[in-house]
Amino acid sequence: MIDRQKVRRTNPTMFSDCELTQMRSSRRDLLFAAPGAIAAAMVSGSSSVRAAAPIARLAGSHMKLSLAAYSFDRYLIKRGTPEQVAAAKMTIEQFIDYCAEINLDGTELTSYYFPIDIPPEYLASLKERCFRLGLDISGTAIGNDFCLPEGPKRNQNLMMCREWIDHAAMLGAPVIRIFAGSVPAGDSEEAARERCVAGINESLDYASQRGVFLALENHGGITSTSEQILKIIEGVKASPWFGVNLDGGNFKTPDPYFDLERIAPYTINAQLKATVFPNGIAEKADLQRVIAILKRANYRGYVVLEYEDQEDPRTAIPTLIQKMRDAIHSQES
C-alpha cells in the first residue's frame, strides 16, 4: 500500500501517474475482496471486520446531477407553520419544480425546509410531484450532532435521525446526509468520537431495516480533516448501509483535494460547491478536478450541487450545473 502521507509531504498538490496507478490497483484489490470478507463475517458472527474498507463498485463510474434545497436557504422557510410556508419566497414544491426546469436528474429535499408537522400525506404529495416531473429524490439531510454526551439533547438527536429515516423511506429517498458533530467544551475528541460512532451504529441498525443509507459528511467539527473522518469510519461496524457524503467544499486543510482523494473510495453520496477553502482561504473550486477524483474512485451515484455563494442562486446555479455536466461528460469520454 502507498504511504499517502509520505506522498503528500513530498508533493503537496498531486499524485504522480505512477502513484495514482498503484493506488487504484490497491483499491481494486480491496474492492473485490470486500464483499466476500463482509459476507464471511456476517456468517461467522465476527466483529473484527469494520466499515473502513472502500465501497465495492460493481462497474465503472457513472454520475447523475441533483441540487440540494439548501442552495435556496435564503428563500426557503425552516420548519415553518403552514402560514409561514405559504408566505415564503419559495416552497419545497417550487424548489422541486425548479429542479425539473433546469433538467436535473434528481432533487435533494433537505429536511430543514419541511414544515413543523409532516403528515404522511405531505410526504406522499412530494413523492408524487417528483415522480410526475421525472425526478428522483436523491436524498435528504439532517443537522444532527452525535458527539453530545448522554442526556436529553443526545436522545433528541438520535430520535430525529430515526424519524427522518422513516421520512426518507416514505419519500423513496435512498440516503440521508448525517453529521458527526463537535467536541463539547471540556471534553476530548477521542470521547466525542466514541459517542459519535455509537450514535451512527445505533442509527444504522434502524436505517438498515428501513432500507435507507446513512452518509457521514465531512462537515467540520470532528470531521474537519480526512484523517478524522477515516478514524470514525474505522470505528463504525461493517454495514452496506453506511458510507461517506463527500462534500467538495468543506475541507479547510492545506490541500482539500488531497483530503477528498482519501475519502472518495468510501463515498456513497457526493456534493460539490462553487468554492473551496485551502488553509481556510476562499478560492474558486476546480469542479473538473473533484469530478476526476470521484471518477478515479469509480463512484456511481448522484453529484449534488450545494450552492452557498453570494450571487443569487437563480442566476448562479444554471451556470454551475452546466459546468458540472460538462465535467462529468468529459470524464466519460
Question: Which residue ranges define each predicted feature?
Answer:
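Hydrophobic faces of well-ordered beta-strands that scaffold small-molecule active sites
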Residues: 63-69, 107-109, 137-142, 176-178, ...
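Conserved, mostly hydrophobic/aromatic
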Residues: 67, 99, 130, 168, ...
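A structural motif corresponding to the C-terminal end of an alpha-helix
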Residues: 98-104, 170-171, 203-212, 296-299
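Acidic/histidine-rich catalytic cores of soluble enzymes
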Residues: 106-107, 197-293
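Short, small-residue-enriched loops and turns at beta-alpha junctions
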Residues: 115-116, 145-148, 183-186, 220-223, ...
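Active-site groove signature of glycoside hydrolases
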Residues: 168-188, 210-219
